[in-house]
Amino acid sequence: MAKVLAINAGSSSLKFQLFEMPAETVLTKGVVERIGFDDAIFTIVVNGEKHQEVTAIPDHAAAVKMLLDKLIRYGIIRSFDEIDGIGHRVVHGGEKFSDSVLITEDVIKQIEEVSELAPLHNPANLVGIRAFQEVLPDVPAVAVFDTAFHQTMPEQSFLYSLPYEYYTKFGIRKYGFHGTSHKYVTQRAAELLGRPIEQLRLISCHLGNGASIAAVEGGKSIDTSMGFTPLAGVAMGTRSGNIDPALIPYIMEKTGMTADEVIEVLNKKSGMLGLSGISSDLRDLEKAAAEGNERAELALEVFANRIHKYIGSYAARMCGVDAIIFTAGIGENSEVVRAKVLRGLEFMGVYWDPILNKVRGKEAFISYPHSPVKVLVIPTNEELMIARDVMRLANL
């Protein structure tokens, strides 16, 4: 038995899960929020019970020390030596990483080199890696990249129709995100379908505050909706998704905003928040729409419409589809969005059951047994995917 920590470090947060492998049992999980503040919040779940403490946590290294001390204090481990491996989520691996990798100084250097592609996320992920190196220097650590799964996309999927040298000189191309999630749910779908993944054409819909769709053929990503950044693709909670690029200078001219300010609007004030004027939270929008708010209903329709179009596009791209998967916060829990997305797809063999579609947050088929195209809800488990990669790469 091995104990493996799965870590997701943000700029002021640290999410963690401790697994016993290979049984894949979750021993504990939690989050440290507001790192760098005097009122940081440490939350840990032990035996289903949530424990919380508000205290000063000056930096990520202090958060790591506190986490390990708590694991001992709550009797989850007896000493630091019981941690056999650590897996770190890293948002962007560029073209350098097509798989998870054991962390070395050279790997850290390469992650730093691609950090300009994810300036909000990669530096924070690296801070988490460094913090664990400081406290547990001899424990093998693995970097698991959100972009790696999509490195199997062919050129016709990942290239933009821009001057080719923009790709060769500046690395401008589609990278795609949520790869760890898309990989987990498509592998799980193959298990639930009882068919080898090599034979399947799957469309994975990761729908959370950030949302992306992936076409997965034979277990490999061949296209995905997000692009060079996570701003592209479908409309999201606060992100615009795809727009006409000529709108950026037009908006600058009309509003007097700078390019950076327009990008800020596209990232943080657009999507369902921008359309509804109410909220980026789908639960608020569903409630408002049910009460007759037309703009909330419009935001939901736009969100579903964009996903619906990607499903049709990817079915054409793969010359058919065997199953459609819904995952992440909205995909797992919103029967309203799933119904709007699936509406009208009968022409391609999608027949779904409104009763089965009431499922929330657990694995289920929501298509009729006779439906040629199966529809599944599969809660994502990126942390488990990270732990599995640690086991594989650290030979635990």
Swiss-Prot record:
Pathways involved: Metabolic intermediate biosynthesis; acetyl-CoA biosynthesis; acetyl-CoA from acetate: step 1/2
Localization (cell): Cytoplasm
Enzyme class: transferase
The protein's Enzyme Commission number: 2.7.2.1
Protein name as catalogued: Acetate kinase
Cofactor(s) recorded in Swiss-Prot or TrEMBL: Mg(2+); Mn(2+)
Pfam families per record: Acetate_kinase (PF00871)
Protein residues bound to substrate: R89
Cysteine-cysteine disulfides: none
Residue positions of the active site: D146
A cellular component term, taken from the record's GO annotations: cytoplasm
Co-factor: note: Mg(2+). Can also accept Mn(2+).
Entry keyword Metal-binding: yes
One Gene Ontology MF term: acetate kinase activity
Annotated binding of ATP, by residue: K15, H206, L207, G208, N209, G210, D281, L282, R283, G329, I330, G331, E332, N333
Keyword annotations of the record: ATP-binding, Cytoplasm, Kinase, Magnesium, Metal-binding, Nucleotide-binding, Transferase
PROSITE patterns hit by this protein: ACETATE_KINASE_1, ACETATE_KINASE_2
PANTHER family: ACETATE KINASE, ACETATE KINASE-RELATED
Keyword ATP-binding assigned: yes
Reaction equation(s) it catalyzes: acetate + ATP = acetyl phosphate + ADP
